[in-house]
Amino acid sequence: WSRAKVALQNGADVVIEMPTAVSCQATDLFARGTVEILQKVGCDSLAFGCESGDGIFFEEAVSQREAIEKEISRFVEENRSLTFASQLTQLAVKEFGEDSALVEALQSPNQQLGLAYAVENAKGEHPMKIVPITRVGSGHLDDALDKTAFASGTALRKALKGNRDEEVLREQLSYV
């Protein structure tokens, strides 16, 4: 629980461990379980990491997704060879164009999770304030260690497994 300890030492009021049944689910179910727990304990804000966007951006993406909700299941049936995110992206491009908030929200895992949080939050009885925290440094899946930027988890795991870039790895781990 070292991450929980660091969070508490740096001003977090409480740290809630997600049940395994929630944390091992697909994005939409993970988001649903997370939002339900946070709303039940009375949280008024939902903060999460993302590549870009603010609360208004995610609200717009949710609105666009709601506008095509009825078409999603039909489109998914017709395009079974694609992942759900790819299917939803194609449908969003068709309906709103490539520059829409929904299309942008589907471009990376963190954006997809942020969208899923926002969708579930909007369904709740007492929606929380959405507080996206923009990622600083390397992208979510970047696998190279870089002295000039915070490393991604992917890069740290790769370096630890391969015992490479020890100096840079030590510098990156000093942030943790």
Task: Give each language-model segment a name.
Residues 1-3:
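N-terminal catalytic cores of NTP/NDP-binding nucleotidyl/phosphoryl-transfer enzymes
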Residues 9-20:
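A glycine-rich helix N-cap at a beta->alpha junction
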Residues 18-176:
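Active-site cores that bind ATP or allylic diphosphates and position pyrophosphate for catalysis
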